[in-house]
Design a protein with these regions (language model features):
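N-terminal [4Fe-4S]-dependent radical SAM core
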Residues: 1-66, 72
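Conserved AdoMet/S-adenosylmethionine-binding subsite of the radical SAM
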Residues: 46-210
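C-terminal accessory extensions appended to soluble enzyme cores
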Residues: 210-224
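Small/flexible residues
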Residues: 4-5, 34, 39, 46, ...
Length: 224
């Protein structure tokens, strides 16, 4: 069984996203890079884009690579051919580990993945959301991850939004992730987030059956 530690590097052969999440740091970073004339952002900003010169990147055997942290590779708008090009390099680097992360995990079922891949989903809450994102609703993401037949799965609950403790824990347990990342918004967006006490209850409950990797844990903005 593979061991997956902390991310050691990122790889962005495809950039851009159309989910329009209100808290998206990557979209703001892309705009800043575009203003500095950094390619491909200077030409494309945050529009979905294949970056051909990044496709054949080589990786060390011990790396754990976060694929496409500047976009959603599995968004419905991404051509299948782009994804296959990315997976070709993943399959060539069997000794390197890769993390995919999406808000559209139902699309994972369209592709084959090796045991050097962790399939992740960002799921901020178990509840339906309004005015936060155009991504598939969190309950749909949870269902897709629970149905996914892959040995290594992960969940990212960041930025965490208010949730129903028992139901959320039920879904996380059903998904059987090898690790769960939990953290608050870092950019002052005043999201509908849970109290720190409630988040700690979630951390404790999930820690009983899988690894929890805590990021920013703080009082909710309305508790300060």
């Amino acid at each position: 069984m593979r061991r997956f530690g902390e991310i050691t590097e990122t790889w962005n052969p495809v950039i851009g996203c159309l989910h329009l999440c209100v808290y998206c740091w990557a979209r703001r970073l892309a705009a800043r890079l575009a203003s500095m004339r950094v390619q491909p952002y200077a030409k494309r900003d945050f529009a979905p884009t294949l970056v051909p010169w990044r496709l054949d990147k080589r990786f060390s055997k011990r790396s754990f690579v976060f694929v496409c942290d500047m976009g959603d590779l599995f968004g419905d708008w991404v051509p299948r051919e782009w994804i296959l090009k990315v997976l070709e390099n993943v399959s060539r680097n069997r000794s390197t580990s890769f993390l995919f992360l999406t808000k559209n995990p139902k699309r994972y079922a369209e592709f084959d993945f090796g045991d050097n891949v962790v399939l992740g989903a960002t799921v901020e809450t178990n509840r339906f959301l309004q005015g936060i994102s155009r991504a598939p609703q969190p309950p749909d993401r949870l269902e897709a991850m629970a149905s996914l037949d892959h040995e290594y799965k992960a969940l990212v609950i960041e930025p965490i939004l208010d949730f129903d403790l028992n139901e959320f824990v039920y879904w996380i347990r059903r998904i059987q992730p090898i690790f769960v990342v939990i953290g608050y918004d870092n950019y002052g967006n005043r999201l509908p987030e849970p109290s720190l006490e409630k988040t700690r209850e979630l951390v404790d409950a999930v820690s009983e059956f899988t690894e929890v990797r805590c990021r920013t844990l703080r009082e909710a903005w309305y508790e300060r």
